UniProtKB/Swiss-Prot annotation:
One of the primary rRNA binding proteins, it binds directly to 16S rRNA central domain where it helps coordinate assembly of the platform of the 30S subunit. This is Small ribosomal subunit protein uS8. It holds the Pfam family Ribosomal_S8. It comes from Staphylococcus carnosus (strain TM300). Gene3D superfamilies: 3.30.1370.30, 3.30.1490.10. Part of the 30S ribosomal subunit. Contacts proteins S5 and S12. One of its GO terms (biological process) is translation. Keywords: Ribonucleoprotein, Ribosomal protein, RNA-binding, rRNA-binding. The keyword Ribosomal protein applies. GO terms for molecular function: rRNA binding; structural constituent of ribosome. One of its GO terms (cellular component) is ribosome. The gene is rpsH. NCBIfam families: PRK00136.1 (NF001109). The keyword Ribosomal protein applies.
Length: 132
C-alpha cells in the first residue's frame, strides 16, 4: 500500500519513539526525509543520521537525543502543510515557532531550510512542519 504523506509518517515515527524514549528509529529513506533529518541533526534535535543501503530505496536510521535526566529534546512536532491543504508563506511571512525557540521546516526553491535560513536568504515556500 502506498503512503499518502511520507513526511507526516516520519514525524509520527519520531514523535512516538521520542515519547517512549527509544534510542533509534528506522524509516524508509527518501531525499526529502534525508534533508529533514540533516536539519534536525544540525539544529541539535537528534544525535545522528545514518543511511543504510538495502535492495530497495534504503533505510534512514535516526538516533534520538535526550537530556541529562532523560528528558526529551524534541518536545513537539507538528505537520503544517498537508496533501489536502497546502500552506505556503512568502519570504516576509515565514512563521517563527515559539518566538524562535523552535524551527519551521520550509521547502523552498533552494531545498528544505529552517525558518531562520529562509528569512536570511529572503525566500518563501511551503511550510512543511514545526519542531520545538
Amino acid at each position: 500500500m502506498t503512503m499518502s504523506d511520507p513526511i507526516a509518517d516520519m514525524l509520527t515515527r519520531v514523535r512516538n519513539a521520542n515519547m517512549v524514549r527509544h534510542e533509534k528509529i528506522e524509516l524508509p529513506a527518501s531525499n526529502i526525509k534525508k534533508q529533514i533529518a540533516e536539519i534536525l541533526k544540525s539544529e541539535g534535535f537528534i544525535k545522528n543520521v545514518e543511511f543504510v543501503e538495502d535492495d530497495k530505496q534504503g533505510v534512514l536510521r535516526l538516533f534520538l537525543k535526550y537530556g541529562q535526566n532523560n528528558e526529551r529534546v524534541i518536545t513537539g512536532l507538528k505537520r503544517i502543510s498537508k496533501p489536502g491543504l497546502r500552506v505556503y508563506a512568502k519570504a516576509d511571512e515565514v512563521p517563527k515557532v515559539l518566538n524562535g525557540l523552535g524551527i519551521a521546516l520550509v521547502s523552498t526553491s533552494e531545498g528544505i531550510v529552517t525558518d531562520r535560513e529562509a528569512r536570511k536568504r529572503n525566500v518563501g515556500g511551503e511550510v512543511l512542519a514545526y519542531v520545538w
